[in-house]
């Protein structure tokens, strides 16, 4: 007996999330829509390292030390792992307010500010919060309909509010925020070391080959090495400079967004309330602190829309999927067997009982 199982398509929350992000692997991977520069990053790293492992490492492992390709492989794998983690993870997107929540916030704002006369500009929607004896302003996001937490900002590219927003990095194809900043920093740090490492041993390789066949002949025989040197030379300055800048920000417990806006170094000279005044403590908090869980329920299941027909319950569904076996019947006489074609409403009424024998004789 064959049983047909009807499966309904489950709608995940990531399919209905607002914003300009793209999702893969059933919501497990989250990126920005503009991924062209991210693919360029992958191509440059993979292409340069492939040439280095294919040509220079084989020669240097024999002539110098077999540890050279081993250390290069470790740097390469660590750089790729941190890049993919920073690119594919949730940077700390804050969910938008539901319609009921947005209406409640609007009522609170109207009750606080009062009715604004027509033609006049409404006052700025700001709340004050105290952090380490410093007043921090919480701004209202007109897109997400929420008061943003401290250090959060709205990314115009991804169209989402991100907690502890640092910047939007096209090289990793994602925003850099509270949940992936440490991986971004480790990526640019390891990439700087890898670039210096490949560049230095390319120079060593050219020098060793030049001692045997000459400098010009070496350049003619190794065009891949020349290409690697050019890529590493022009990449080195930007990557190392970016790493130094973010090392400075980590030491101060500051974000790129705050540094650009001059939040703690402007005219007011307001002290940074998030800094511990100690470089070691700031580095430990930013890079080694507990990683907060994602508040964006990407893989949650949306509830079924209410319709006229009630969906079957779990017990009804499970019982309907099981093969039904006929109930055992007792041996009945032909006189006692009921008619299958008749329903309880169609069964004939019972015959009236016969009068007692004594009553019949009295009537006679």
Swiss-Prot record:
Which Pfam families does the record cross-reference, listed alphabetically?
Answer: DHHC (PF01529)
The answer to whether the entry has keyword Flavoprotein is no
Recorded hits in InterPro entries, A to Z, give: Palmitoyltrfase_DHHC (IPR001594), PFA4/ZDH16/20/ERF2-like (IPR039859)
Question: How does this chain sit within the bilayer?
Answer: Multi-pass membrane protein
Name the catalysed reactions. Answer: L-cysteinyl-[protein] + hexadecanoyl-CoA = S-hexadecanoyl-L-cysteinyl-[protein] + CoA
Q: In this protein, which residues make up the domain named DHHC?
A: 139-189
One example of a Gene Ontology biological process annotation:
protein targeting to membrane
Where does it live in the cell?
Endoplasmic reticulum membrane; Golgi apparatus membrane
Q: Which residues lie on this side of the membrane: Cytoplasmic?
A: 1-35, 85-183, 250-364
UniProt keyword annotations, A-Z: Acyltransferase, Endoplasmic reticulum, Golgi apparatus, Lipoprotein, Membrane, Palmitate, Transferase, Transmembrane, Transmembrane helix
GO cellular component terms, A-Z: endoplasmic reticulum; endoplasmic reticulum membrane; Golgi apparatus; Golgi membrane; palmitoyltransferase complex
Per the record, the domain of life is Eukaryota
Tell me the active site. 169
Name the segments for region: Disordered: 303-364
Q: In which residue ranges is the amino acid composition biased (Polar residues)?
A: 310-323
Q: Could you say which EC number(s) this protein's record lists?
A: 2.3.1.225
Bias (Pro residues) occurs at: 346-356
Lumenal face of the membrane: 57-63, 205-228
The transmembrane segments are 36-56, 64-84, 184-204, 229-249
Molecular function GO terms recorded = protein-cysteine S-palmitoyltransferase activity; Ras palmitoyltransferase activity
Report the protein's function: Palmitoyltransferase that catalyzes the addition of palmitate onto various protein substrates, such as ADRB2, GSDMD, HRAS, NRAS and CGAS. The ZDHHC9-GOLGA7 complex is a palmitoyltransferase specific for HRAS and NRAS. May have a palmitoyltransferase activity toward the beta-2 adrenergic receptor/ADRB2 and therefore regulate G protein-coupled receptor signaling. Acts as a regulator of innate immunity by catalyzing palmitoylation of CGAS, thereby promoting CGAS homodimerization and cyclic GMP-AMP synthase activity.
Q: What is known of its domains?
A: The DHHC domain is required for palmitoyltransferase activity.
Report the sequence similarity comment from the record: Belongs to the DHHC palmitoyltransferase family. ERF2/ZDHHC9 subfamily.
Q: How does it assemble?
A: Interacts with GOLGA7.
The name this protein goes by in its record: Palmitoyltransferase ZDHHC9
């Amino acid at each position: 007996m064959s049983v047909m199982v009807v499966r309904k398509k489950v709608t995940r929350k990531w399919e209905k999330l607002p914003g300009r992000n793209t999702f893969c692997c059933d919501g497990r991977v989250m990126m920005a829509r503009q991924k062209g520069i991210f693919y360029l990053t992958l191509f440059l790293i993979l292409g340069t390292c492939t040439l280095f492992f294919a040509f220079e490492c084989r020669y240097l492992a024999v002539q110098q030390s077999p540890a050279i390709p081993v250390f290069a492989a470790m740097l390469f794998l660590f750089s790729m792992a941190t890049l993919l983690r920073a690119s594919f993870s949730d940077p700390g997107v804050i969910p938008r307010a539901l319609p009921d929540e947005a209406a409640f916030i609007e009522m609170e704002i109207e009750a606080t500010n009062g009715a604004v006369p027509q033609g006049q500009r409404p006052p700025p929607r700001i709340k004050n919060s105290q952090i380490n004896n410093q007043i921090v302003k919480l701004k209202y996001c007109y897109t997400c309909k929420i008061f943003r937490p401290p250090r959060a900002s709205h990314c115009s590219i991804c169209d989402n509010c991100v907690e502890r927003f640092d910047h939007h990095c096209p090289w990793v194809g994602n925003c850099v925020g509270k949940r992936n900043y440490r991986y971004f920093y480790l990526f640019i740090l390891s990439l700087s070391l890898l670039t210096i490492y490949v560049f230095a041993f390319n120079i060593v390789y050219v020098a060793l080959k030049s001692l045997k066949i000459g400098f010009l002949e070496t350049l003619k025989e190794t065009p891949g090495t020349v290409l690697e040197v050019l890529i590493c030379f022009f990449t080195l300055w930007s990557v190392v400079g970016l790493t130094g800048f973010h090392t400075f920000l980590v030491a101060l417990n500051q974000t790129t967004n705050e540094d650009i806006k001059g939040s703690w170094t402007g005219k007011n000279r307001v002290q940074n309330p998030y800094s511990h005044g100690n470089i070691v403590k700031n580095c430990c908090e930013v890079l080694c602190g507990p990683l907060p869980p994602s508040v964006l329920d990407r893989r949650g299941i949306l509830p079924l829309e209410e319709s006229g027909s009630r969906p079957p319950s779990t017990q009804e569904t499970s019982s309907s999927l099981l093969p039904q076996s006929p109930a055992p019947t007792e041996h009945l006489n032909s006189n006692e067997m009921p008619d299958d074609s008749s329903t309880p409403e169609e069964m004939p009424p019972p015959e009236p009982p016969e009068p007692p024998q004594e009553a019949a004789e009295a009537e006679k």
